[in-house]
Amino acid sequence: MAANIAAAAAAAQEVDPVLKKAIKLLHSSNPTSAAELRLLLDEALKARFGPEKSLTNNMTPRMLEDEANFSGRAATPPQQPINADEIINLTNSPDKEPSDSVDTIADSDDGLSAVGIVNTGDTGDFGDLNCCVCGEMVFTATNRLIECSKCGAMYHQECHKPPITKEEAADDQEQNWQCDTCCNKPTSSGRTTSSAAAVTPTVFIADEPMPLTSKAKSSVASSRSSNSSNSSSPFYRPEPSSSTNASSSSSSKHGHKSSSSSSSKSHKEERSSKSTAASSLSAIGGMEKHNSSGTSSRRSGSSTKSSSKSSSSKHHESGSSSKRRSKQ
């Protein structure tokens, strides 16, 4: 401990005396302390940099004038006199009616003490900042004013139905909160889609063409409608149905007969063509057989001739041999 005290004393002795004097003048309340501090600084600058770097040469006349008029630093600040007219006795003062131009803002941790009174002068400028239920701007820590993120209306936590919870009034969830009116309001897009679905009829477009039966039915229906329209006209004369039926039956019979006769003729022609083809094939076969028999008879005739020739030659040879024998 004694060593620490000795070290502190040695450090105090090593401090520059000029710095000690400057610190004393800086905290002094003497009016001439500013001039003395400037002179001390001038001496230090001259000792280090020469007379050209004097602070007095660089000071403006206004700075010199302010230094001459310096009154010094007072040890204790003077107390301002209190006028007796500004003291108001709140205990005996009559109750004042609240004016519309005064808005009270109470914001504290316990929610009981008021921070201050703001005199707006005109409530129209701050009409959007009031609660849309009670119409007041006063709020506390437990009954804050929350703005709806959709419609922009302001609600007290207790004025809104249902009351706004602390989780909904938190700083991170306050920007996403919506009032009950906006939450229960149906969206316009849902209405438009439902109305469009109710008004727009459903139309089915077939990918494939309609069959012929439907076309025939439609043509029959159109013919019936045309007949009914013609019969309703005053100049329409109905035709006898029996004659039309008879003509249609006769035409159908005639068509059937003609078709049957044509089919029988075609069958006969086919049969005759088949018979002619068969006869031609048989004739061709007979000719081939006749040719083959002629060639065979020719071959047999030539063979008989050759055999007769050979026999005659043999007989001639035998005759000549017998003659030779008789001559001998």
Swiss-Prot record:
Region (Disordered): 215-328
ZnF segments: PHD-type: 128-185
Main location: nucleus
Matching PROSITE patterns: ZF_PHD_1, ZF_PHD_2
SUPFAM superfamilies (UniProt xref): FYVE/PHD zinc finger
Region (Sufficient for binding to IntS1 and IntS9 and for 3'-end snRNA processing): 1-45
Subunit-level organization: Belongs to the multiprotein complex Integrator, at least composed of IntS1, IntS2, IntS3, IntS4, omd/IntS5, IntS6, defl/IntS7, IntS8, IntS9, IntS10, IntS11, IntS12, asun/IntS13, IntS14 and IntS15. The core complex associates with protein phosphatase 2A subunits mts/PP2A and Pp2A-29B, to form the Integrator-PP2A (INTAC) complex. Within the complex, interacts with IntS1 and IntS9. Interaction with IntS1 is likely to be important for promoting 3'-end processing of snRNAs.
Family of this protein: Belongs to the Integrator subunit 12 family.
Name by which UniProt lists this protein: Integrator complex subunit 12
Organism: Drosophila melanogaster (Fruit fly)
Lineage: Eukaryota, Metazoa, Ecdysozoa, Arthropoda, Hexapoda
